[in-house]
Amino acid sequence: MTKKSTKAPAKKAAPAAKAAPAAKRGAAADSGKVAKTQLVEMVADQTGLTKKQSEEAISSMLECVVSALQSGKSVGLPGLGTLSVKETAARTGVRPGTSEKIQIPAGKKVAFKVASTLKGNL
């Protein structure tokens, strides 16, 4: 009679820890940035509107701001500042890595001027 060798059962691999959704939100909060979803929740809490109504209001406001900027208008946000479109001049730049001089064409950019009331409160 032959003796069967007894092997120890194989160890099961430890299950991989899943990142909790709350941990992801916490990481965004730690970065100092407020996401649109967080802004929607804040508006809903302060106004008593539903999250859906708050999201629609914020989206509509952002669309209006973008539309005004695209048409060349300035947008004043009381207590926050003013968004405006500024022309940028053509200029000579240097390509990183090759140090080659390149011509950067004229264009437009969005500028933001902080309200003095906000500056004083920071």
Curated annotation (Swiss-Prot):
Residues 1-10 have a biased composition (Basic residues). The keyword DNA-binding applies. This is DNA-binding protein HU. Belongs to the bacterial histone-like protein family. Histone-like DNA-binding protein which is capable of wrapping DNA to stabilize it, and thus to prevent its denaturation under extreme environmental conditions. InterPro entries: Hist_DNA-bd, IHF-like_DNA-bd_dom_sf. Keywords: DNA condensation, DNA-binding. Residues 1-32 are annotated as: Disordered. SMART domains: BHL (SM00411). It comes from Deinococcus radiodurans (strain ATCC 13939 / DSM 20539 / JCM 16871 / CCUG 27074 / LMG 4051 / NBRC 15346 / NCIMB 9279 / VKM B-1422 / R1).
